[in-house]
């Protein structure tokens, strides 16, 4: 069975048992009344069952309801169909004030019907010939308004300075100021020029997201013809069906696939309604993607440390044990489905490098947009500063240093021999984002 953990807030006067049974019925075989065609099928075989209800600590009217769904309810290899049932009409049910899907346990038999990520972590490292450290990226800013040639120039400077990747912003598709084909051509030129100068393999996440699946595939095919290593998709706004098709194309044609999660906070940020990001991350691992943005813990966007580390384990590891202290409600066995590299992006800079290295480990992408392009000397020195800071943090971690305690000292020491890093340290020494997270663990 597929197991689901729902956070249920019933309307006043509705007992939790009734609310849990309603969730199980409405998201599987049930409707609002008894119908004569019920007698033509084996309801006991197909109906969802609410098998456990727990009160939420510290809340008077919230419950975690556990529901089991028979596997025969779902089409094989279709995240779209799975979500249509489990998070469909039931979320508008009048008997509930709010409903949130906290976690899913996907059985191994169902996992095996999915291709999953096009390549996975090890294959990506082998393609790039980069080992033993996080990868470095940069989102090109301003996100909208640059011409294709200026955009390509910004990519080249960042890649030449030492970054592994540059990135289209999620809302860069094919607008009047920069059509997609022009951007792809100038970015490919930037990649090849930077590779020739540095001797390293470089990439730019070319955003293939489009208004139709046919147009999306046309962009992916053009990227492959240019010989670039990686493309990108906005998987929530683009949709799971489009994403799965693109992931299959990427595996067949040797392209890495970077996934952006634009729109996720509409779904996952409120604590009592919607869907926790760990569910979206599991769905992405099944649908397919080699990278996905997972929060930073230390940057400008929402993300509590323990919850974020729970996402990261679910994305990368083959087997993840139940651990309620990190928001993981079920043990998940991925049966060798390739892993997804978590991407930390949003309001991060060189002072965050030791903390990011300690939190995310080697198998991650650390992405500095403003933290590269905001360098007072330009894009290439900004990239140099990030590469030096990463090298210093990775060397200190390998030598057994405590990055959480000694991080600032490590960066200060490295800045003594890197003027680019010293300038970056001076610019961002006062920048902090100190706000309480909205989506927190139950105490």
UniProtKB/Swiss-Prot annotation:
The active site is at residues 141, 260. It catalyses: 2 (2R)-3-phosphoglycerate + 2 H(+) = D-ribulose 1,5-bisphosphate + CO2 + H2O; D-ribulose 1,5-bisphosphate + O2 = 2-phosphoglycolate + (2R)-3-phosphoglycerate + 2 H(+). Heterohexadecamer of 8 large chains and 8 small chains; disulfide-linked. The disulfide link is formed within the large subunit homodimers. It is found in: Plastid, Chloroplast. Its EC number is 4.1.1.39. Mg(2+) binds at residues 167, 169-170. InterPro entries: RuBisCO, RuBisCo_large_chain_AS, RuBisCO_lsu_C, RuBisCO_lsu_C_sf, RuBisCO_lsu_fd_N, RuBisCO_lsu_N_sf, RuBisCO_lsuI. The lineage of its organism: Eukaryota, Viridiplantae, Streptophyta, Embryophyta, Tracheophyta. It holds the Pfam family RuBisCO_large. The record marks 300 as: Transition state stabilizer. Binds 1 Mg(2+) ion per subunit. Substrate binds at residues 89, 139, 143, 261, 293, 345. One of its GO terms (cellular component) is chloroplast. This is Ribulose bisphosphate carboxylase large chain. It comes from the Eukaryota. It comes from Sesamum indicum (Oriental sesame). RuBisCO catalyzes two reactions: the carboxylation of D-ribulose 1,5-bisphosphate, the primary event in carbon dioxide fixation, as well as the oxidative fragmentation of the pentose substrate in the photorespiration process. Both reactions occur simultaneously and in competition at the same active site. Keywords: Calvin cycle, Carbon dioxide fixation, Chloroplast, Disulfide bond, Lyase, Magnesium, Metal-binding, Monooxygenase, Oxidoreductase, Photorespiration, Photosynthesis, Plastid. One of its GO terms (biological process) is photorespiration. Its cofactor is Mg(2+). Belongs to the RuBisCO large chain family. Type I subfamily. The disulfide bond which can form in the large chain dimeric partners within the hexadecamer appears to be associated with oxidative stress and protein turnover. The basic functional RuBisCO is composed of a large chain homodimer in a 'head-to-tail' conformation. In form I RuBisCO this homodimer is arranged in a barrel-like tetramer with the small subunits forming a tetrameric 'cap' on each end of the 'barrel'.
């Amino acid at each position: 069975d597929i197991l689901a953990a729902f956070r249920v807030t019933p309307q006043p006067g509705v007992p939790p048992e009734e609310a849990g049974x309603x969730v199980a019925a409405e998201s599987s075989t049930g409707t609002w009344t008894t119908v004569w065609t019920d007698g033509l099928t084996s309801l006991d075989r197909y109906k969802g069952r609410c098998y456990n209800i727990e009160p939420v600590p510290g809340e008077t009217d919230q419950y975690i309801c556990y529901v089991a769904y028979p596997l025969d309810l779902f089409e094989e290899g279709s995240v779209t169909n799975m979500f249509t049932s489990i998070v469909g009409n039931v979320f508008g049910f009048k008997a509930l004030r709010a409903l949130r899907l906290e976690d899913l346990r996907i059985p191994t038999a169902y996992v095996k019907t999915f291709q999953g990520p096009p390549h996975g972590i090890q294959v990506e490292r082998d393609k790039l010939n980069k080992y033993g450290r996080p990868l470095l990226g940069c989102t090109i800013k301003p996100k909208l308004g640059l011409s294709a040639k200026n955009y390509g120039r910004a990519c080249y400077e960042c890649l030449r300075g030492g970054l592994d990747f540059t990135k289209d912003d999620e809302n860069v598709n094919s607008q009047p100021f920069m059509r997609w084909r022009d951007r792809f051509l100038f970015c490919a030129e930037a990649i090849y020029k930077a590779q020739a100068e540095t001797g390293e393999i470089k990439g730019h996440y070319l955003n293939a997201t489009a208004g139709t699946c046919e147009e999306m595939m046309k962009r992916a095919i053009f990227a492959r013809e240019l010989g670039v290593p990686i493309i990108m998709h906005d998987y929530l706004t683009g949709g799971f069906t489009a994403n799965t098709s693109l992931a299959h194309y990427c595996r067949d044609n040797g392209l890495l696939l970077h996934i952006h999660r634009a729109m996720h906070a509409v779904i996952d940020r409120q604590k009592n309604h919607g869907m926790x990001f760990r569910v979206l991350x599991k769905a992405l691992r099944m649908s397919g993607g080699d990278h996905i943005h997972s929060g930073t813990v230390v940057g400008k966007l929402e993300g509590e440390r323990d919850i974020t580390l729970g996402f990261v384990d679910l994305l990368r590891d083959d087997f993840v044990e139940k651990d309620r202290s990190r928001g993981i409600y079920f043990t998940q066995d991925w049966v060798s489905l390739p892993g997804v590299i978590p991407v930390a992006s949003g309001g991060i800079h060189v002072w965050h490098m030791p903390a990011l290295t300690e939190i995310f480990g080697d198998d991650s992408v650390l992405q500095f947009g403003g933290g590269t392009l905001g360098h007072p000397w330009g894009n290439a020195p900004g990239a140099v500063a990030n590469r030096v800071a990463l090298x210093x943090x990775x060397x200190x971690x390998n030598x057994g240093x405590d990055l959480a305690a000694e991080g600032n000292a490590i960066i200060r020491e490295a800045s003594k021999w890197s003027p680019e890093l010293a300038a970056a340290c001076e610019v961002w020494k006062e920048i902090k984002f100190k706000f309480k997270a909205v989506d927190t663990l139950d105490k």
